């Protein structure tokens, strides 16, 4: 399959913006350059006229729980631990594989329609999440969440390992797998060491929640005499590739550890704000060389999966927190949501930029609209002015999965109907 995108304003993220074409063959970008300069030997099977559109790499949602779309609006305005123990965990105990499948498809629709092409997910019944990903056409890094203090901890680890063996590299390479220890307060050091050993054997990374709340910091300090970051260093977790969600409360020593170990951080500003967890020291992390991407967290604590809005929030929150309007400029935020996210997930050799050799994950934004005019700076427009409705066309791995805001891979009405029924049944059963 050969696809040609013509006459777009291209923001490749790597290198300067230009007006031109992007040519794709067998899912890979083979040309990105000025209009009319595509090699004469390239014969497109399909051509998209992107006049009046901006082309960017697909957005990368570095941390979410896709099936929790089913709990959107169910448990709001509560502290994190009360939210988990009183509301979320009881209803999660009722979830079936079918429930998680429909919740994940609902999340997939929402992500595609807001420009996300790749997401990192930690949950359970992950075979059904992977099935949804395969069907809807997204790219994803998936892991089974592991609770070390549970009576089923060993079984969960075995299931997590089996999931990796089944799905890592599946869906024509669109699905990658990790192991997912939930957090230091649910996974004691002895259990974490088992997870680390398994990740070494399977040669995959780890996805964990770290330093999210002050309560977590105080609990870990009381139990182990150190910060969660220092505890992870001591257990050997950081000897493996790690995706650390949140990292809100960090000392300078913590930041140095993250930088030295090459830990990837998923910054989730809206979830952190909604749960009053705090403001992550993103500026200090970036200055120290920590890899930072952007995530939404789950729709139960955000309450959407809108990476367009998340970019704007990330930029504005750091400016007001630092008292400095120059920090996190638009171009850097867009980079964090694309190439930066790819680095955090260990996928930088495949996605994140519009360069020859990369997989063709492309978003076309319709910009000939009042709120995106005049065209002084499209990078700034995407961060400060655009909305999810401006996403017109989405391409994943060279396949057009949404055109004119219509998702082509699944029936949207069926997904909405099934998700609504599922969510109502769950809440009525609690």
From Swiss-Prot:
Gene Ontology MF term list: 5'-methylthioadenosine deaminase activity; metal ion binding; S-adenosylhomocysteine deaminase activity
SUPFAM superfamilies recorded: Composite domain of metallo-dependent hydrolases, Metallo-dependent hydrolases
Enzyme Commission (EC) number: 3.5.4.28, 3.5.4.31
Protein name: 5-methylthioadenosine/S-adenosylhomocysteine deaminase
Catalytic activity: S-adenosyl-L-homocysteine + H2O + H(+) = S-inosyl-L-homocysteine + NH4(+); S-methyl-5'-thioadenosine + H2O + H(+) = S-methyl-5'-thioinosine + NH4(+)
Organism from which the protein derives: Desulforudis audaxviator (strain MP104C)
Entry annotated with the keyword Hydrolase: yes
Role noted for this protein: Catalyzes the deamination of 5-methylthioadenosine and S-adenosyl-L-homocysteine into 5-methylthioinosine and S-inosyl-L-homocysteine, respectively. Is also able to deaminate adenosine.
Enzyme class (EC, first level): hydrolase
């Amino acid at each position: 399959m050969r696809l040609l995108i013509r006459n777009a304003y291209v923001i490749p993220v790597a290198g300067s913006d230009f007006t031109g074409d992007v040519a794709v063959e067998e899912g890979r970008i083979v040309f990105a350059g000025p209009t009319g300069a595509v090699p004469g030997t390239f014969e497109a099977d399909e051509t998209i006229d992107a006049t009046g559109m901006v082309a960017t790499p697909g957005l990368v949602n570095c941390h979410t729980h896709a099936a929790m779309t089913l709990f959107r609006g169910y448990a709001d305005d509560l502290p994190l631990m009360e939210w988990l123990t009183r509301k979320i965990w009881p209803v999660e105990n009722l979830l079936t594989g079918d429930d998680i499948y429909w919740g994940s498809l609902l999340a997939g629709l929402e992500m595609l329609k807001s420009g996300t092409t790749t997401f990192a997910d930690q949950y359970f019944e992950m075979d059904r999440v992977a099935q949804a990903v395969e069907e809807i056409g997204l790219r994803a890094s998936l892991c089974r969440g592991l609770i070390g203090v549970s009576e089923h901890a060993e079984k969960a680890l075995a299931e997590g390992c089996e999931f990796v063996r089944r799905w890592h590299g599946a869906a024509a390479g669109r699905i990658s797998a990790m192991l997912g220890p939930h957090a230091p307060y649910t996974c004691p050091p002895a259990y974490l060491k088992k997870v680390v050993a398994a990740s070494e054997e399977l040669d995959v990374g780890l996805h964990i929640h770290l330093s999210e709340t002050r309560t977590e910091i105080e609990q870990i300090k009381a139990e182990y005499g150190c910060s969660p970051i220092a505890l992870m260093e001591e257990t050997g977790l950081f000897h493996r590739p790690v995706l650390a969600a949140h990292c809100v409360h960090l000392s300078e020593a913590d930041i140095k550890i993250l930088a030295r170990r090459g830990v990837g951080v998923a910054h989730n500003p809206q979830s952190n704000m909604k749960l009053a967890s705090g403001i992550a020291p993103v500026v200090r992390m970036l200055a120290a060389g920590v890899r930072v991407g952007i995530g939404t967290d789950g729709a139960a604590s955000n309450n959407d999966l809108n990476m367009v809005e998340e970019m704007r929030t990330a930029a504005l929150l750091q400016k007001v927190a630092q008292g400095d309007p120059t920090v996190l400029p638009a171009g850097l935020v867009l980079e964090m949501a694309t190439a930066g996210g790819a680095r955090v997930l260990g996928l930088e050799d495949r996605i994140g930029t519009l360069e020859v050799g990369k997989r063709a994950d492309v978003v076309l934004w319709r910009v000939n609209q009042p709120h995106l005019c005049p065209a002084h700076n499209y990078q700034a427009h995407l961060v400060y002015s655009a909305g999810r409705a401006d996403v017109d066309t989405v391409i994943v791995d060279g396949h057009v999965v949404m055109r004119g805001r219509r998702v082509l891979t699944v029936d949207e009405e069926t997904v909405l109907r099934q998700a609504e029924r599922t969510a109502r049944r769950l809440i009525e059963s609690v």
